[in-house]
């Protein structure tokens, strides 16, 4: 099994991005699967262009995109990506699309095809906080998740794809009182646990357990 893992460069005035720092620490093999980690720019279309190049060349069995969600208290596999860019802040090249479809020929939304409930369970088993998230936002993270699912549907129809947000690293909250953060090694362990579940459930349906929210 081959798994493509992506991490964004820093954005929004941050000097580092825990997504990129964490994937740099991943081993080359997890649970027998070959892991390829790539950096993607926090730029709307360019992030998808880089992803497409690697999907076409690597032909992965699964794509896991990782992104920073400052303020979240644990690792959060995303349930759905919507066909809409609505940027609260500009991306790293100054693009700020508002109410713009990501793909004119794409679906209104794509649900993650990764075993998100099993991923949460595996992260919990590693002793780390995790939960299913029902919104990936409308910035570059949602954009890349949507593009990943669109591209896999077009170029690797038997592959799975999805996205997981992670919290700030400790170093990022020194001047942000009362903001949640995690140690980088723990973030990396959580990603490894999620990948272990992706491999473990490659030929099985996801766990049937509560992961929803009331609001």
Swiss-Prot record:
GO terms under cellular component: cytosol
Superkingdom as given in the UniProt entry: Bacteria
GO annotation, biological process: proteolysis
Reactions the enzyme catalyzes: Release of an N-terminal pyroglutamyl group from a polypeptide, the second amino acid generally not being Pro
Keyword field: Cytoplasm, Hydrolase, Protease, Thiol protease
SUPFAM superfamilies listed in its UniProt record: Pyrrolidone carboxyl peptidase (pyroglutamate aminopeptidase) (SSF53182)
Location relative to the cell: Cytoplasm
Gene3D superfamilies: Peptidase C15, pyroglutamyl peptidase I-like
GO molecular function: pyroglutamyl-peptidase activity
EC number(s) on file: 3.4.19.3
InterPro entries given in the database record: Peptidase_C15 (IPR000816), Peptidase_C15-like (IPR016125), Peptidase_C15-like_sf (IPR036440), PGP-I_bact-type (IPR029762), PGPEP1_Cys_AS (IPR033694), PGPEP1_Glu_AS (IPR033693)
Active site per UniProt: 78, 141, 165
Hydrolase is among the record's keywords: yes
UniProt cross-references to HAMAP family, sorted A to Z: Pyrrolid_peptidase
Family: Belongs to the peptidase C15 family.
Subunit structure: Homotetramer.
Described purpose of this protein according to its UniProt entry: Removes 5-oxoproline from various penultimate amino acid residues except L-proline.
Name of the featured protein: Pyrrolidone-carboxylate peptidase
Native species: Streptococcus pyogenes serotype M1
């Amino acid at each position: 099994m081959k798994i493509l893992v992506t991490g964004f460069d820093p954005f929004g005035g941050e000097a580092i991005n825990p997504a990129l720092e964490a994937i740099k620490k991943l081993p080359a093999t997890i649970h027998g699967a070959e892991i390829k980690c790539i950096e993607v720019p926090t730029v709307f279309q360019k992030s998808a262009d880089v992803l497409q190049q690697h999907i076409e060349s690597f032909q992965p069995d699964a794509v896991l995109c990782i992104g920073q969600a400052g303020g979240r208290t644990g690792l959060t596999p995303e349930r759905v990506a919507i066909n809409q860019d609505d940027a609260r802040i500009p991306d790293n090249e100054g693009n700020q699309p508002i109410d713009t479809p990501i793909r004119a020929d794409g679906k209104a939304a794509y649900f993650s095809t990764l075993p998100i409930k099993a991923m949460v369970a595996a992260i919990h088993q590693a002793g780390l906080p995790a939960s299913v998230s029902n919104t990936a936002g409308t910035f570059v993270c949602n954009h890349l998740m949507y593009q990943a699912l669109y591209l896999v549907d077009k170029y690797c129809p038997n592959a799975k794809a999805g996205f997981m947000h992670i919290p700030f690293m400790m170093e990022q909250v020194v001047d942000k009182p009362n903001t949640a953060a995690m140690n980088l090694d723990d973030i990396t362990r959580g990603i490894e646990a999620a990948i272990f579940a992706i491999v473990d459930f490659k030929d099985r349906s996801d766990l049937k357990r509560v992961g929803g929210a009331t609001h």
